[in-house]
């Protein structure tokens, strides 16, 4: 359950030649579902009394728009950033929600399909939670970084942004030797800031969802230990109680982590 469906084994901690097919497939499918849900809500929008689905989407749109207004004061930029924030929130929420599926449901179906096709079902790996894959979570945060860099250049100009890279946060001086030293220090601090923001943005989402996935696996092991003994029956009952309690609590984590990821994206872009 902790192995990915990938093209090859990783040769290093960071190996950009490794592709996790399951993360890519589920991310794309859920992105398509996000697009469809928002498109369906927009298509059915009318000035009359809204249905429950339309009302829920309108509340969500208004909520995200208000959050964007408090961070991004340029109305023209908000026309892109606010819908982006909405898409991020819905997409990450849907990806996180995959953690509520039974641990063995889709992997067992996939193993049977691979076995029926003549493959080895014991090595038919499949992980359905894209945000519990560090490459998936970091991919999202890197995308936010690229948008942030784009707006830096768009608003400040390439020259203005380059000037900021070597003059902030410690400023500069008219003395050339000191200006060079300050420029190097400022540039290093800017790189550290961008890197730390991107790492913390992605790893926060990954860490919370990966931990939640592990807890679900541990709870599933309790159910797998069922036997007609006092201990086995106790573990099975504990499996049901713990599974229900953690699933209810995890719903809050799913929404909260999507909200935090969206808010940080708006803050970084803003």
Stretches found by the model and what they are:
Residues 1-270:
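Selective transmembrane helix interface/packing segments
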């Amino acid at each position: 359950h902790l192995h990915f469906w990938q093209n090859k084994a990783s040769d290093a901690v960071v190996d950009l030649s490794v592709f996790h097919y399951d993360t890519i497939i589920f991310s794309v499918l859920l992105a398509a579902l996000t697009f469809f849900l928002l498109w369906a809500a927009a298509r059915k929008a009318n000035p009359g009394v809204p249905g429950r689905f339309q009302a829920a989407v309108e509340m969500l749109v208004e909520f995200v728009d208000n959050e964007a207004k408090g961070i991004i004061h340029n109305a023209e930029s908000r026309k892109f950033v606010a819908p982006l924030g909405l898409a991020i929130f819905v997409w990450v929420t849907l990806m996180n929600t995959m953690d509520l599926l039974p641990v063995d449901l889709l992997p067992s179906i996939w193993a049977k399909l691979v076995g029926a096709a003549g493959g080895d079902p014991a090595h038919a790996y499949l992980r359905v939670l894209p945000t519990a894959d560090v490459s998936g979570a970091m991919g999202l945060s890197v995308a936010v970084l690229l948008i942030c860099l784009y707006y830096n250049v768009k608003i400040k100009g390439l020259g203005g942004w380059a000037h900021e890279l070597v003059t902030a946060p410690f400023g500069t001086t008219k003395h050339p030797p000191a200006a060079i030293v300050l420029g190097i220090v400022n540039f290093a601090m800017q790189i550290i800031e961008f890197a730390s923001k991107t790492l913390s943005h992605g790893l926060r989402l990954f860490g919370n969802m990966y931990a939640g996935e592990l807890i679900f696996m541990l709870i599933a092991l309790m159910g797998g230990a069922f036997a007609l003994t006092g201990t086995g029956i106790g573990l099975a009952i504990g499996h049901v109680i713990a599974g229900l309690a953690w699933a209810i609590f995890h719903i809050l984590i799913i929404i909260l982590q999507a909200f935090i990821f969206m808010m940080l994206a708006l803050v970084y872009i803003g």
